[in-house]
Design a protein with these regions (language model features):
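Subset of outer-membrane beta-barrel
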Residues: 1-211
């Protein structure tokens, strides 16, 4: 069995005040000069999934995801990017395991900037850099996860999960960190009562100070 999906996602923050022109040339403050702008990230996702092996109680499946990214910061900056994700998942009667490679192509965003002469002057006088162009890179990461569903009775079960986020871009402030690989663990529990009531709890964002 195969599945094909198309998704469009938007994350945005609207009505952000732009105070670049707040101060007039005579150093007076004019609040009427405050305008607002929007920061938005758009992503077009093309997804494909395939069952590799299916039995009565188990299933092994594979999926790949291609994403086209468009980012916009008001009228100041825009970026286009592209990336790939892939994953493999095994599901048993009570257990499931998965591995996902995010940004396996090293997702990039190529930024371009546009400022008016007045905005450039304000940035210069306030000792800010005036960007021209840049490339933002998201390095590959590997996510490992597994879970087991414990039966506590005829109508109650407890699902326990453990995930590990592996990054390869140097030492991070995670519990397990090294110059080559850093590991960020995550734990979760879900109590299921009669398939009607669910209670979830989890813990993540374990950190340690980098010396």
């Amino acid at each position: 069995r195969r599945a094909l999906g198309i998704s469009l996602i938007r994350f945005a923050i609207d009505e952000i005040p732009n105070t670049l022109n707040l101060v007039e040339p005579d150093n007076s403050i004019n609040y009427n000069n405050i305008k607002t702008f929007t920061v938005a990230d758009w992503a077009l996702l093309l997804s494909f999934a395939q069952n590799l092996k299916t039995t009565e109680n188990t299933n092994l499946s594979f999926g790949i995801n291609a994403k086209v990214i468009y980012r916009k910061i008001g009228s100041f900056a825009t970026a286009w990017g592209f990336g790939l994700d892939a994953g493999l998942q095994y599901r048993g009667q009570r257990s499931h395991f998965g591995v996902m490679a995010r940004d396996i192509s090293t997702t990039f965003n190529a930024w371009s900037f546009k400022f008016t002469d007045q905005e450039k002057e304000v940035l210069y006088l306030t000792k800010n850099d005036i960007p021209v162009k840049s490339t933002e890179l998201t390095m590959p990461r590997l996510v490992l996860g597994g879970g087991y569903n414990f039966r506590l009775g005829s109508s109650v079960s407890l699902l326990a999960e453990l995930n590990a986020d592996l990054t390869f871009d140097g030492k991070r402030n995670t519990v397990l960190s090294g110059n080559t690989v850093s590991v960020d663990p995550r734990l979760g529990r879900e109590a299921n009562i009669e398939d009607v009531f669910f209670v979830r709890a989890g813990i993540n964002n374990f950190q340690q100070a980098i010396k």
